[in-house]
From Swiss-Prot:
GO terms for molecular function: ATP binding; tryptophan-tRNA ligase activity. A motif ('HIGH' region) lies at residues 10-18. It comes from Treponema pallidum (strain Nichols). Homodimer. InterPro entries: aa-tRNA-synth_I_CS, aa-tRNA-synth_Ic, Rossmann-like_a/b/a_fold, Trp-tRNA-ligase, Trp-tRNA-ligase_bac-type, Trp-tRNA_synthetase. It catalyses: tRNA(Trp) + L-tryptophan + ATP = L-tryptophyl-tRNA(Trp) + AMP + diphosphate + H(+). It holds the Pfam family tRNA-synt_1b. This is Tryptophan--tRNA ligase. One of its GO terms (cellular component) is cytosol. A motif ('KMSKS' region) lies at residues 195-199. It comes from the Bacteria.
Amino acid sequence: MLRVLTGDRPTGRLHLGHYAGSLGTRLRIQSEHECFFIIADLHTLTTRHGRAQLAELPALVRELVLDYLACGIDAQRAVIYLQSAVPEVTELAFIFANLVTVPRLQRIPSLKEMAQAANLSELPFGLLGYPVLQAADILLARAHLVPVGKDNESHVELTREVAKRFNRLYGEVFPLPRALLSDCATLVGTDGQAKMSKSLGNAIFLSDDEETVRRKVRAMYTDPARTRADIPGRVEGNPVFAYHDAFNPNTDEVAHFKERYRAGRVGDTEVKDALARALNTFLEPIRARRAQLEQQPAYLARVLEEGCARMRAEARKTMQRVKEAMGLSARPLVHLP
């Protein structure tokens, strides 16, 4: 059985983009592999470290646990844990920081994108070291597979480099993890301009109610050149059809819509209404489970507490191996006269 690690920063409710990115993959593989799902609260400090932002963290962590369980993550099988509750990760990150050069980190494209999204004019040390901490997350769990979106594949590649260099210097301690990419490309936002994001206001959340989903779908960007239903439209690059492909299980219906859309024989409203129905059918069981879980705060706390304990046990095993390999294991004290 292979070991899996992936997770999310607690910055808001999960949305369809998360599901299409790696969450759907997690659900499919949790019965086949040993899964660790990290709530990466330390990673949020790289772009959200103000006092007011930190005060929001407990509620955001709770939202993430709710979304995980509502989607179908099985807390009996998988380990759901809070990054900051496992102090070994920062110890391992410091060790790894000595195996990676600054120019190598500067070549990771997502770091500049994160800095721009957070309106940072300069790259803080913490953000520059984000991939190193991520490597520590992955290798502390001794993970073999890392479900990620395409935009984070470079982070997994860096993790492989770190593991290879450590193993070459000190002996075989870590597996070489590989990225497990979603079958779905990065899901664009409802505005068609960028990937789905809470901060950009272009997200459909997994917890959105039926009417909210319908309203957001009706407002979705389509083909701007198509001003009438009888004008042939573009399916490629059209967010409405990207969402149909990702979430509408009726492939015959989707294929028929595409054929008619290209021929100018169906209007945007009909295609969007069908999408809203498909999304609400997909989201309804998630909403129902979430409503039940919201009434069980003690259970939510227990899931996280038990997950943190299980991960701490694994972290101690890993760090013992790391220190023994490096010659850093505890030695008897020298009693000076």
